[in-house]
Amino acid sequence: MLPGCCKNGIVISKIPVMQAGLKEVMRTHFPEYEIISSASAEDLTLLQLRRSGLVIADLAGESEDPRSVCEHYYSLISQYREIHWVFMVSRSWYSQAVELLMCPTATLLSDVEPIENLVKTVRSGNTHAERISAMLTSPAMTETHDFSYRSVILTLSERKVLRLLGKGWGINQIASLLKKSNKTISAQKNSAMRRLAIHSNAEMYAWINSAQGARELNLPSVYGDAAEWNTAELRREMSHS
């Protein structure tokens, strides 16, 4: 990380009033940050990204294809791993966002998130913040799935993949960590979904974030346990692969 970059941030939104509002939130609660704003990630320079420790991106204001926008951000996340990426996601973007943007350095918030939750996320930083807001996994967002009646019969490999997904890892990262191909990891994820009788990524993350999912996968970090992301945890995951 370049010297001083932790005090530089970027606000991205195609909606001018949202840009202004997010900048005002940062100015009020984090005066130590120097914030620039942009209507699009494509307009940012390499230097601006390299200097920044925080990006708040309003995806709810995007009018383009959700997948192409998320894929572009996925590419940026892969290149700039020191940045804490905070994405504000609308209901229609939820499925694409959890598939492509969930990772250890990103946080997904609802586009109707209370300001205090955004402030808490920024203050927590990219190693302590929750990976996904409870508002995004609430019944209103996930169309009410009742998982309590489902009997869980998952293989060890399937549990391992779902556990890492629940902790914010992407398919590529899991494949690299477990020394398996992307195809194998995707197959294990899909097999687990079939066993659980769930049919979409959004429903899968809803199960992972449910009380049953957290219990079955031993995932207290879903509710904010920062210790999951330290080096010791990574060593434990690798030793179990």
Curated annotation (Swiss-Prot):
SMART domains for the chain: HTH_LUXR
Keyword Transcription tagged: yes
UniProt domain HTH luxR-type: residue ranges: 147-212
DNA-binding region: 171-190
GO molecular function: DNA binding
Induction summary: Repressed by H-NS, activated by LeuO. Member of the yjjQ-bglJ operon.
Keyword Transcription regulation tagged: yes
One GO BP: response to methylglyoxal
A Pfam family recorded for this sequence: GerE
Keywords from the UniProt entry: DNA-binding, Transcription, Transcription regulation
InterPro entries reported in the protein's UniProt record: Sig_transdc_resp-reg_C-effctor, Tscrpt_reg_LuxR_C, WalR-like, WH-like_DNA-bd_sf
Subunit structure: May form homodimers.
Full protein name: Putative transcription factor YjjQ
Provenance organism: Escherichia coli (strain K12)
